[in-house]
Every structure is written in C-alpha cells, then in structure tokens.
Amino acid sequence: MAFETFSVALDKDKTLIFETGKIARQASGAILVKMNETWVFSSACAASLSEAVDFLPFRVDYQEKFSSAGRTSGGFLKREGRPSEREILVSRLIDRSLRPSFPNRLMQDIQVLSYVWSYDGKTLPDPLAICGASAALAISEVPQNCIIAGVRVGLVGGKWVINPTRDELSASKLDLVMAGTASAVLMIEGHCDFLTEEQVLEAIAFGQTYIAKICDAIEAWQKATGKQKNFSAVLDMPEDVQNVVSDFIREKFEKALSFRDKEALEQASKELEESVIANLVQEENSDFSLLNVKAAFKTAKSNQMRALIQDLGIRVDGRTTTEIRPISIETPFLPRTHGSCLFTRGETQSMAVCTLGGENMAQRFEDLNGDGAARFYLQYFFPPFSVGEVGRIGSPGRREIGHGKLAEKALSHVLPETSRFPYIIRLESNITESNGSSSMASVCGGCLALMDAGVPIKAPVAGIAMGLILDRDQAIILSDISGIEDHLGDMDFKVAGTAKGITAFQMDIKIEGITHKIMEQALAQAKQGRSHILNLMTQVLASPKGTVSKYAPRIETMQINTSKIATVIGPGGKQIRQIIERSGAQVDINDDGVINIAASTQESINKAKELIEGLTGEVEVGKVYNGRVTSIATFGVFVEVLPGKEGLCHISELSKQKVDNISDFVKEGDKLAVKLLSINEKGQLKLSHKATLED
C-alpha cells in the first residue's frame, strides 16, 4: 500500500493526523495517529478459525512504551511486560467501542494492538488509540457494520473542551471518554463533580459532533484506500432453523420464565437447551448444525423475554420496568475491620470493607507521567462461587479491574480533603453473590463501609444499572437489570451519584448505537432509582460516624519549614529511622513540609511529634532549657538543649562559686537547666547554668 494520510481538525492545536502505508505494511490494517507530539500506532489483523465458535474471539491490547516519554521503567526489569492497570482500562475502552461494530456470527479471530510511541506529556493518548484502532479496522479486510471514532470531553471553566490536555483535564469537572458512529453513541465512560443529567447529556451531544466529523473522514478514506471486506467469514442463520427452534421452545420457555429466582431459571433454561440440541441438531443437515441450533436458541430466548416485557410490561423476575429489587443492608458487618457493610440487592451481594492507614499503605504506580501514589483505591473481587461455579483464582482479570475502577471513580468525588482526613483509604468489594449490577452494589456497599469507618464523605453515593429493550420502534428502559437482562438486552448503562448529581457513569451498547432521546430517558429513570436506593441507605446510616474505629491507627499531621526536611530525615535517613524506632510511629514527610504521623496509640504519636519538634524547633536567646549533659571537658560541659542542638556551658558558667572539678558537679547524662546567652556567627550556642540560679 502506498503512503496515505489525512487529517481532522478538532480545535486550535488539536488536529488528528492519520497515516498508513509506511509502517507495518504486512498487517491487514495499520495506522499511525498523531496529535501534536503524541503518536499512537494501531494494527488490525484477522485469522480464520479452525472451528466455528458461538462468540467473537476479539482481543485488544494497548501498551504505553516508557521510551515514548524518554523514560525507562523504575523496576528491576526494564522491558515492558505485564500490562498496568491503566493499560488494561484503555484496552477495555477500545474493545467496548469496537465490539458492537462487528457483524453477528463473524467467524474470525481478530486482534487489535495499540502502542504509544511518542508522548508529549500534554496530549492524552487514549482517544487517539480508539480512533487509530477503528481506522486500522476500517481499511482492513475485517468486516464491520459501521465506522466508529472516540473522543474525550472535559468541562473547564464552564465550557466544554474536546480532547482536553493533561493540564486542562486536571482542572476539569468532567472526564468523559465516548465512542460512536456518525449518528449514534456506542460507548461512554466517565466521572464528574456532581453534574446534572442535563449537563451529562449536553456533554455527550458535544462530543458526538466531533465523533461524526472523525467518522465521516475515516469512511471517506476507507472508500478511497481500504481493502475489500471479507464478509464470507460471516455465517448466516437459515430462516427455517430460527423458526423451528423458536416454535420448539415457545411454550417450554414460557414455563421456564415463571421461575423467579436465578438458579431455577438457569436450570430450566439449561435443560431446555439440552432438549433442543437432542431433538433438532442434524448431523446430515448443515443448516441444523450444533452451532446454528445453539445460536437460534439464544435468539429465541431473547425474543421471548423481550416479548414478555413489551406485551405485558413484566420482566423475567416478575418486576415492572422501573422496579428495584429488594435491598437489605447490614453495617457494621465484620467486628474487627475499620469499616464494613453487607449490601444485598436481589441476588447480588457485596461485602465491602474499608481499611485506613498511613502513607505507607498508598497504592504506588508508574506510568508515562512518572511515579505516583493513590490515596484512595478500590479493589473488586469476583470469586467463582458468587455465581455457583468452579473457576480460576489469582491475579484480577480485566473485568474485575474495570468494575473496581468504575466504583472507585464514583466514590472518589465525595472524599474529604487530605488536610481534613489524612488517612490512606483502601476499599475492597467482595462479591459473594452475583445476578447483575455487582459494580453498582460495590458503590453502595463501599459508600456505607466508608461511612462506618468514620470517613467524613461529602454525601452518600448510590449506583444503579439500567438496561434497554429496543424492538418494534419501541424503547423500553429497565431499572436495576439482572444478569439475564444484561446478557439478552441491548444496553448496560451504569450511573452512580449523590442526591445532588452524578459522579460516575458507564454505558455499553450491543446494537449499532442509541439516540440522545433514549439516553435522556435512561438517565431520568436512573435518577429515580438512585434516589430510592439512597433513601434506603440513609435510613440505615444517615451520616458518617463521628470517629474512626478503635482498631484503626491514629494519624496526625504537622507542618515544618521545607528547609528543615533534610534535618528530620538526616544523613541516609538516619534521623527519621531513629524517630520511628524511638516512638513506634510511622512517619512520612511530603515535599511541602507536611508530616503524617500514624500509630496505634496516642502516646506514640506524641513522642514522634516531640522528637520532630526538637529537631525542627529554633533555639531562642534568653530562653531557659532543661538540657541533657552529653559530654564533659576540662573547660566545661556540652549540653543538648534540643534534639540535635548542643551548646557549651563553660566551667565559669556552672555555678556562682568556683568549680574545681567538673565531674564532682555534674555527670554525663544528667539533666541541667541552662540559659542560652548568645549564638555566635558560626551558630555555636553559649550556655549558662549560673544564669538560671536565683540570687
């Protein structure tokens, strides 16, 4: 392929430049996207499957090369390896944006790789990666139903900003990443400072105008330079197969839908599928293959569930479209934790635990912008027993990381300032039962665990997951969706926030986008559900507890002059190690001179403060100190008046009477009251015990 390029101007100093034909020419599609000095490369390749499967084997991997920012990893291994949390989250953004664009029953193994090759420290690479991955697929042979693009939207100084820079984003009240086609939204994810539903809709509409502009440019470029699409890899569903399967299960599945609990419904559905396979699969007839019959069964189930909702307004568990499942709350739940809550909504349950600690408990991370530490972090655990299965236990999967980060963002906006509450906060959400909306249960349970731990949050936060049934030109929004509704429905729209406004949201679409009107309806219905849940939460725990748990460490802060930081640390950290050893407290010093002292007892904190004040305190001429004799010489004694500060009390200043033998007057280690007479130009202290004696 010859070298080709095109550009899309978004705003001043924000122009997307797409290039192909120079790099990775053996890939099915390869694109280099540039904005200023941030460059992101994306490739798309596909391979034929050795055997047909009933899912789309689509994999996205995004990697930020440290060399792109002129850095190397601070770890022992300098080669990029296991993806970081941020890389996994961006990989998920790309995957969720692109997945709805593929045709149903596409029998290809598809891989998209994205690498950050150059990073200027200003232009954020994730929206470039979404656009680059989409463009790489667009010019490849991989079949797609639509072209997509992605952007980031911020709210800075009351104005919407497209693809905000890193500095703009730090001042923004909104961080929204969204993707869609030229006419509809496919994916959104973001968090914000208590924006209203109307503001979020306005932000989405603002971003959609730029998405349409990018999509139109990619589509025009595809028509001019793209490869022929390989639609032969898409399997058709024979109409008679779908009809036969639908007729076979109609009455039987209607009976299965009468079961209101998840386990009974799943068992009935499993038995029905086995019956369908046993009766309808025909080895001699390829139309009635196992793959086709299973796909037709899934479609028939979905259609029947949808019909129940559309015709009767009743869902599979008997609820109306706006009804929330029964909620029970127990807090505190665990006796020795700093804060805990058992939050149950229907058959979804989260055991949330809050742990408070000092600076050493912060979550360290490393990315293109350097090293950092998270003051607050939420970790989500989804063991296989929560859905009655046997499975792998180990490092978290992409889904666990994504769900945890969404809940973390939802709660981060209500945390107090560090100056008011200096603790490091770790939240964990242990999903002990799951039937949909477990990430939003993590938000609710996590909020209550924070309140139980005595974290003075600004307001309670609740979350709810919304679904969509879109058929017959009719859009039905479902509140608090269950697992089967998530699986067979058209949308998963999670919204979290306070009574005042939204703090986080995430939407995934399985169809080719939804309209502004549907999102408006979903957000309005989500607000009603959120208010209901918040009311139940505040009935159990109206406000955060006034004090932290007796099992939590005590933390106090003190401020010192930045010029004294080196004094407190000492050569090679000697001084601060001595403070920690002598006090039993954990001491952490920030670059701004703020010192955090954490200990299990108040006595340890007081001892550490005393030692630090001694090191950083300034001696005053004329002041009397109760010092300690550190050494004795023939001409006088050296007395430590403050930790690390010694002065000389000459033999003539020891007493009003003549002292012949100093050792007869005072011993090393004795306490001795001395008055500071003067400080010479070298900083040496002249002390007098005689001056403290009464006439």
Curated annotation (Swiss-Prot):
Reactions catalysed, as given in the entry: RNA(n+1) + phosphate = RNA(n) + a ribonucleoside 5'-diphosphate
Residue positions binding Mg(2+): D486, D492
Keyword terms of this UniProt record: Cytoplasm, Magnesium, Metal-binding, Nucleotidyltransferase, RNA-binding, Transferase
Keyword Methyltransferase attached: no
Record localization: Cytoplasm
SUPFAM superfamilies reported for this sequence: Eukaryotic type KH-domain (KH-domain type I) (SSF54791), Nucleic acid-binding proteins (SSF50249), Polynucleotide phosphorylase/guanosine pentaphosphate synthase (PNPase/GPSI), domain 3 (SSF46915), Ribonuclease PH domain 2-like (SSF55666), Ribosomal protein S5 domain 2-like (SSF54211)
Role description: Involved in mRNA degradation. Catalyzes the phosphorolysis of single-stranded polyribonucleotides processively in the 3'- to 5'-direction.
Annotated protein name in UniProt: Polyribonucleotide nucleotidyltransferase
Native species: Chlamydia trachomatis serovar A (strain ATCC VR-571B / DSM 19440 / HAR-13)
Protein's gene: pnp
